[in-house]
């Protein structure tokens, strides 16, 4: 019996409806649905579980929603390489590329072990303050260091493999995976990178020096960013746009390739460039 986890945007009626249908569909095929307690309550499923129980037992994951929902699930499963089926019920869909109409044919392939998977690189992000580790997390998209609401720049020292890169004076800095290249990094002027490439991007946000440009580094790079000066202003580290860490002057953020990857089940009817054309409206006037 295959154990299939279901995650969804809990308060979205459409996601609730698809989740309820999916529970029935899985049970008819002798699969065990794994549903967290919040979603279970909304879809009338009696056997709700904790996220930890689901993470430890799932053999396949279905995410109903948008890219944000999938990214949070990817972090939850960062310690396990479980195939994730991302179903687009949100607005973006760079990651959740499978439509509702494709969901059940794709799941049939998954149950028959004939599905296609792409492995997406993740980043390991650690924050140290003096000798103390204050935060550790894996991210699928990016780690962003930025300032608070006041309009002053911050100074960040960047080192790559212990070699000095530069001091960035900017509104902030984005360190992203190839998957994250179409997120915040793209909005800040970073390049689009094919998601299966192995590399890390550093993209400054509104740098004070115009020659501070985005840079693409080897996936083997270890990047260390030190908060040099914040002008008495709050500085934050945001992980995948969902988890926040308050930083102080002198804090060090170390970023390197994570040992695990996110395994995404791909749509049989789409390719990466088709998704780019659709989402970025290339060729339209």
From Swiss-Prot:
Keyword NAD found: yes
GO cellular component, one term: cytoplasm
Catalysed reactions listed for this entry: NAD(+) + ATP = ADP + NADP(+) + H(+)
Annotated keywords: ATP-binding, Cytoplasm, Kinase, NAD, NADP, Nucleotide-binding, Transferase
Pfam families linked to this entry: NAD_kinase, NAD_kinase_C
Residues the record marks as active site: 67 (proton acceptor)
Binding site for NAD(+): 67-68, 141-142, 152, 169, 171, 182-187, 242
GO biological process, one term: NAD metabolic process
Cofactor: a divalent metal cation
EC number(s) stated in the UniProt entry for this protein: 2.7.1.23
Localisation: Cytoplasm
Record-level Gene Ontology MF annotations: ATP binding; metal ion binding; NAD binding; NAD+ kinase activity
Protein family according to the UniProt entry: Belongs to the NAD kinase family.
Matching HAMAP family: NAD_kinase
Function of the molecule: Involved in the regulation of the intracellular balance of NAD and NADP, and is a key enzyme in the biosynthesis of NADP. Catalyzes specifically the phosphorylation on 2'-hydroxyl of the adenosine moiety of NAD to yield NADP.
The protein, known as: NAD kinase
Organism per entry: Trichlorobacter lovleyi (strain ATCC BAA-1151 / DSM 17278 / SZ) (Geobacter lovleyi)
Gene name of the record: nadK
């Amino acid at each position: 019996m295959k154990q299939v986890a279901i995650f969804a945007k809990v308060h979205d009626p459409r996601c609730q409806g698809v989740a309820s249908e999916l529970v029935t569909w899985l049970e008819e095929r002798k699969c065990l649905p794994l549903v967290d307690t919040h979603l279970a309550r909304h879809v009338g499923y009696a056997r709700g579980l904790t996220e930890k129980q689901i993470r430890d037992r799932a053999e396949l994951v279905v995410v109903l929603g948008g890219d944000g929902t999938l990214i949070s699930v990817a972090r939850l499963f960062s310690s396990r390489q479980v195939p994730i089926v991302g179903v687009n019920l949100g607005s973006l869909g760079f990651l959740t590329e499978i439509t509702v109409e494709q969901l059940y044919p794709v799941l049939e392939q998954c149950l028959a072990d004939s599905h296609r998977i792409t492995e997406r690189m993740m980043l390991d992000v650690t924050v140290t303050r003096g000798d103390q580790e204050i935060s550790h997390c894996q991210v699928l998209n990016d780690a962003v260091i930025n300032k608070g609401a006041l309009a002053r720049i911050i100074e960040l020292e960047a080192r790559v493999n212990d070699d000095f890169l530069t001091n960035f004076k900017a509104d902030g800095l984005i360190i992203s995976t190839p998957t994250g290249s179409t997120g915040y990094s793209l909005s800040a002027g970073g390049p689009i990178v094919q998601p299966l490439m192995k590399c890390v991007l550093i993209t400054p946000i509104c740098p004070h020096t115009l020659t501070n440009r985005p840079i693409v580094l080897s996936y083997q790079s270890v990047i260390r960013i030190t908060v040099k000066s914040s002008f008495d202003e709050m500085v934050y580290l945001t992980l995948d746009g969902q988890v926040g860490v308050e930083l102080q002057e002198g804090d060090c953020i170390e970023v390197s390739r994570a040992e695990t990857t996110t395994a995404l089940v791909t749509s049989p009817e789409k390719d990466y460039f088709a998704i780019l054309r659709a989402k970025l409206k290339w060729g339209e006037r």
